[in-house]
């Protein structure tokens, strides 16, 4: 487990946070995915940066070892749902963006499944304990949903939303 006093942070912020182009992109992502702050974007960027770094380092390995590790990395990203196809290549990993990671957050998937009317309501339902994955309550909107868990997302069994879900109306999935 490790010593709790020696924990590392999961993200690395920008070296210069006030670049105008990046500010605009970050604001769009915050609105599109209902994020609370830019740290959540930086976590996604760091995760994708690490995956891309692993892919680049694989290119330097001998072909025999490279093929084994390449398959392992592709399988991991496929199980996480970040890669769409099981037979992806390193080029697909190198072309990943932070949006690929943000699409796999529990908050986004709850909204896209229609369990919440808005992306912000999805965040609130999760933090208030109304959402479960295979019957287990998950209260972190940033939880990365694995491909196998996606169909198991539902309301928590004792949640009042289980019997009376929020009225759906028109949910525009393309806009969010």
Curated annotation (Swiss-Prot):
SMART domains per record: Ribosomal_S4, S4
Entry keywords, A to Z: Ribonucleoprotein, Ribosomal protein, RNA-binding, rRNA-binding
Keyword Ribosomal protein: yes
Domain annotation S4 RNA-binding: ranges: 104-166
Transmembrane regions: none
Domain of life: Archaea
Any one GO cellular component localisation term in the record: small ribosomal subunit
Similarity annotation: Belongs to the universal ribosomal protein uS4 family.
Matching HAMAP family: Ribosomal_uS4_A (MF_01306_A)
Identification of the protein by name: Small ribosomal subunit protein uS4
Species whose genome carries this gene: Sulfolobus acidocaldarius (strain ATCC 33909 / DSM 639 / JCM 8929 / NBRC 15157 / NCIMB 11770)
Encoding gene, per UniProt annotation: rps4
